[in-house]
Amino acid sequence: MLGRAQRTLKRKVCYSGVGVHFGKAAMLTLEPAEENTGVVFSHHAASEQYIPARLANVCGTGRSTTLSLDGSVISTVEHLLASLYSFGVDNVRIYCSEDEIPIGDGSAQVFMDLIDQAGIQEQEQTVQIARLAHPVYYQYQDTILAAFPSDEFKISYTLHYSHNSTIGTQYRSLVISEESFRKEIAPCRTFALYSELCFLMEKGLIGGGCVGNAVLFKDDGVISLGKLRFPDEPVRHKILDLIGDLSLVGTPFLAHVIAVGSGHSSNIALGNRILEALQHEQELVK
C-alpha cells in the first residue's frame, strides 16, 4: 500500500445555511482534529459523542445520505464528505446545530470554499492508501456499479433518463483529484425532475429546496438560477454524490469505479463491497 502524511485543517471555519430537505437554518463548523481522528460529526462542540463518517453508521439513503449513532442523526452529508475526501482531509471535527448539513447552492462549492478558507495542515503520522486488488460488483435492476483495480481513483458514470429528454443520456469519466474536483465536479448542483416535486413534498423532503439550491428539469426545459454550469451538469453531480458516499469506506483507496444510474443506496452497497474486499486483502497480507 502507498502512504502519505495525514492532513487536517489549519483553523476553524463556520458557515450558516438552510438544509434542503428539512428546511431548517443550521450553523456548520469545521475544526482541526488530531491524527487518526477521522472525519466525525456532532451537534455540539461540548459533546463527547461523535458520529464517525463510516459505512457502518449509514441509516438512510433516501435522496441523501444520513448517518446515525446512539440516537444522534446527521443527514445530507455527501457533498461535504466529497469535498473533504477530494482535498485529502483525513481528520476533522464537524459540528452542525441541526440534523441536516446546509445545502449551500446545491453544489459542493461552499464546502470547497470553507476548506480553502481554513487551509490544510499536514500531520506527522501517515495514512495508508489502499489499492483494490480484485474487481467488485453490485447490481440492482437497471443500476450497475463496479470497481476495478487501478493506480488512480477514477469514476466513469453513465446517467440515462429515458423519461426526460432534457437530461437524456449523459456520460462523464474523470480521475478524481483536488484539481479535477475543484474545476469539474464541485460547482455542479443537485437536481430533480419537475414532475417529482409533489412526490418529494409528500415524503417530507425538499422543505428548503428552491431554484437557488437546485436545478429542476422539465420535459421542455430547465428551471434554474442562471444557466447550467456544464451541459452535462446532472451526471457530474452524480459523480459528486458518489465520491461522498464512497468516502464512507473510511480510508483513501485507488480503483476505477464504473456506475450506471446509481444513487445513494447503491453507492453505499458498492462501498460496503469495496470495504469487504480491502479488509480481506489486508488480512491476506498479514
From Swiss-Prot:
Pfam families: LpxC
GO cellular component: membrane
Gene coding for it: lpxC
Keywords: Hydrolase, Lipid A biosynthesis, Lipid biosynthesis, Lipid metabolism, Metal-binding, Zinc
Entry protein name: UDP-3-O-acyl-N-acetylglucosamine deacetylase
Protein's GO biological process: lipid A biosynthetic process
EC category name: hydrolase
InterPro entries documented for this protein: Ribosomal_Su5_D2-typ_SF, UDP-acyl_GlcNac_deAcase, UDP-acyl_GlcNac_deAcase_C, UDP-acyl_N-AcGlcN_deAcase_N
Family designation: Belongs to the LpxC family.
Record-listed Zn(2+) binding positions: 79, 237, 241
Catalytic activity, as annotated: a UDP-3-O-[(3R)-3-hydroxyacyl]-N-acetyl-alpha-D-glucosamine + H2O = a UDP-3-O-[(3R)-3-hydroxyacyl]-alpha-D-glucosamine + acetate
